[in-house]
Design a protein with these regions (language model features):
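C-terminal terminal-subdomain/extension
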Residues: 61-113
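Compact nucleic-acid interaction/catalytic patches
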Residues: 16-20, 25-59
Length: 113
């Protein structure tokens, strides 16, 4: 498992009406490789509003439809639920994801990059 990989998760949340949702792993690689049983993920939705905390994704990443990663809705998911691999983000998309995560967490105000 690597940062930036997309996985289909069946019934990821009891509040989600969909049968499954696709998530992208956003935890840092050292945490993913650790003994911890969960990783931080961001959900992917089909509707894109163009806000700064959303990253557009689509067929290039292994999806059927144009969609977006929502960095304002991070959740912890057990690694054992991340088994249905869909695809991965390009280096360019990972940079967009990093920027959207910094905005979502207000991290650009606290850290110099």
């Amino acid at each position: 498992m690597n940062r930036g990989e997309l996985y289909r998760v069946y019934k990821g949340s009891k509040h989600d009406p969909k049968k499954y949702r696709i998530f992208v792993v956003v935890s840092r690689q050292v945490f993913i490789n650790s003994e911890y049983s969960s990783v931080i993920c961001a959900p992917i939705y089909s509707n894109y509003n163009g806000i700064s905390t959303q990253v557009p994704v689509g067929v290039q990443e292994g999806l059927k439809y144009d969609s977006c990663i929502r960095c304002d809705e991070l959740i912890s998911i057990p690694k054992s639920m991340l088994t249905d691999y869909i695809g991965h983000l390009s280096e360019e998309k990972l940079e967009e994801l990093n920027k959207a995560l910094r905005i979502a967490l207000a991290a650009e105000y606290y850290f110099e990059y």
